[in-house]
Amino acid sequence: MVEPREQFFQDLLSAVDKQMDTVKNDIIDVMKEKTSFLVSFENFMERYDTMEKNIQDLQNKYEEMANNLVAVMADTKIQLGAIIAQLEIIMVNGTPLPAKKTTMKDATSLPPPNPNNEQSVFTNGSPTSGKIGETVKKNLTNAMFFTRSEWASSEPFRQKFLTPEIQAILDEQFANKTGIERLHAEGLYMWRTQFSDEQKKMVKEMMKK
């Protein structure tokens, strides 16, 4: 027969063992949760790194697009400036540069400027008068003394400086355009197709001065 004191200690040891088992199980659960948390945290960091990389890629693409846009705008500005410069040369000197594909043989000189820095040119006249060949005076301080609308609408001017072949091409290519829109389209076409590389280089050098 077990004595009461011995039974007490046995019961105490049994209770301690059970408590230790419970603590061990709790520790195991905590370690599992820790492992799960670490895995989740690693996954989160991977997703964060991926997101950061995607943001950087988007930023690089945006900067590339911005640089391309600036380059296109600069190239367009040079081309339009070169077209205007060529028109200025034609209008002031009355003699266009030799064309790359078609020589403008029909071009003739405009009257030279007078001492008052004025020049007489032929235009279609005002829409109300209906007169063609009316002589008007314009100040040469503005080198483009032909306005854009006059260039786009003046048949005598076009016939004076463009060969029939070029006029036919422009009329066919840009029949659906009028006014300033047609001027820009025709100018860009002439720049791309009628200017030699040497002429383009010369005009670009002029624009830098």
Swiss-Prot record:
GO CC terms in record: host cell cytoplasm
Keyword Coiled coil among record annotations: yes
Top-rank taxon, per record: Viruses
Location(s) in or outside the cell: Host cytoplasm
Entry's Gene Ontology BP terms: symbiont-mediated activation of host autophagy
Record carries keyword Coiled coil: yes
Chain spans, region Disordered: 103-131
Coiled-coil annotated spans: 39-75
Main location class: host cell
Comp. bias intervals (Polar residues): 116-129
Stated induction or repression of this protein's expression: Expressed in the early phase of the viral replicative cycle.
UniProt entry keywords in alphabetical sequence: Activation of host autophagy by virus, Coiled coil, Early protein, Host cytoplasm, Host-virus interaction
Biological role stated in the UniProt entry: Induces host endoplasmic reticulum stress and consequently activates autophagy and NF-kappa-B signaling pathway. In turn, may induce autophagy-mediated STING1 degradation and innate immune evasion.
Family that this chain belongs to: Belongs to the asfivirus K205R family.
Protein name: Uncharacterized protein K205R
Lineage of the organism: Viruses, Varidnaviria, Bamfordvirae, Nucleocytoviricota, Pokkesviricetes
